[in-house]
From Swiss-Prot:
Domain of life: Eukaryota
Recorded family membership: Belongs to the HAD-like hydrolase superfamily.
Annotated disulfide bonds: none
Pfam families cross-referenced by the UniProt entry: Hydrolase (PF00702)
A GO cellular-component term linked to this record: nucleus
InterPro entries: HAD-like_hydrolase_domain (IPR051828), HAD-like_sf (IPR036412), HAD-SF_hydro_IA (IPR006439), HAD-SF_hydro_IA_REG-2-like (IPR011949), HAD-SF_hydro_IA_REG-2-like_cap (IPR044924), HAD_sf (IPR023214)
Classification via SUPFAM superfamilies: HAD-like (SSF56784)
GO molecular function ontology, one term from the record: phosphatase activity
Lineage: Eukaryota, Fungi, Dikarya, Ascomycota, Saccharomycotina
Protein name: Uncharacterized protein YMR130W
Keywords tagged on the record: Hydrolase
Length: 302
């Protein structure tokens, strides 16, 4: 078969569909959920309550440098530096607003705002996808593989998704492993098999790999990382930021600066309205796919 291959939603057939899914893991931020408004707009909304006048564009421009330096100075959200993740994020907020002096109460309010639906939006297609998937494949194991810290658990509970993935959540902070390293996917698979030993009654480990899928919004961390581990990687590109779906393959690659901006500059309401119009799937190789929404992805797992 020649790649890349574009598959319109009305052209799916058995030849295009993949093996029955046994394990599907998801990235977290900008995959399961996203911010309703760009992050720095939300920071400024809180800031105004405390008399802090800041421009969201200025804070957005500050963010990549602040984020990069903080990761270098306090790796893994401060895990090895004697500070808790909440303190790590407090430092980030303070440094993003610099040279403005901001009160601790304001930082605490920002942190609380990002613990649930005040800031975040769960895409409607996720809920439908999970429900339909479980209906068609009741034994499929769902998990999360994410480069994040344990504050994530509180958020996941507050937005009603914790029970869906409980028992199969793999965070870089806890494992000292991170995407795109194949080791975090290998760890996830080994852990799932240890908790679900019945899988080995029917399949070998190598055979199970043919039924493992990971869905996420980053080319390197999610699509390529999963494929390198022997999984099928699915890039959920709601904004066509990589250009695959619009045939703009000449789009510049997302460097560290652009990826940092991607993390914070999303308006999920606008994104949702736009990505539902794209209904094609792009198959890049035998184990790499690109979709713009999860409704399209349902065709992959009939």
């Amino acid at each position: 078969m020649t790649y890349p291959k574009r598959i319109p939603i009305n052209a799916w057939s058995e030849v295009h569909r993949v093996a029955r899914p046994l394990i599907i893991t998801f990235d977290a931020y900008n995959t399961l959920y996203a911010t309703k408004l760009p992050v720095m707009e939300q920071y400024c909304i809180v800031g105004r309550k405390y008399g802090i006048k800041a421009n969201p564009s200025t804070l957005t421009n500050n963010f990549p440098h602040v984020f990069k330096k903080l990761k270098e100075d306090y790796p893994q959200y401060g895990k090895y530096s004697g500070i808790k993740p909440e303190q790590w994020w407090s430092i980030l907020i303070r440094n993003v607003f610099a040279p403005n002096e901001i009160p601790d109460e304001m930082i605490n309010e920002i942190l609380m705002r990002f613990e649930g639906f005040d800031s975040y939006f769960v895409y409607p297609d996720l809920i439908k996808f999970l429900k339909d998937l479980k209906s068609r494949h009741p034994d499929v194991i769902l998990g999360i593989v994410s480069n994040t810290d344990p504050i994530f658990y509180k958020l996941l509970k507050n937005i009603g998704l914790f029970e869906t993935f409980s028992g199969h959540i793999y965070l870089s902070y806890e494992l000292n492993l991170a995407k795109p390293d194949r080791a975090i996917f290998q760890y996830a698979l080994d852990d799932i098999i240890s908790k679900q030993p019945h899988l080995l009654e029917k399949y070998t480990r190598e055979e199970i790999l043919q039924h493992c899928f990971h869905i996420g919004d980053e080319l390197k961390n999610d699509l390529e990382g999963a494929e390198a581990a022997g999984w099928t990687g699915i890039l959920l590109d709601r904004n066509d930021k990589y250009g695959f779906l619009s045939n703009s393959i000449s789009k510049p690659m997302r460097d560290e600066y652009k990826l940092s901006i991607d993390k914070i500059d999303n308006n999920s309401i606008n994104t949702w309205e736009a990505n539902t119009k794209q209904t094609d799937t792009l198959q890049l190789s035998e184990r790499k796919y690109v979709v713009s929404n999860l409704e399209v992805l349902e065709e992959l797992f009939p």
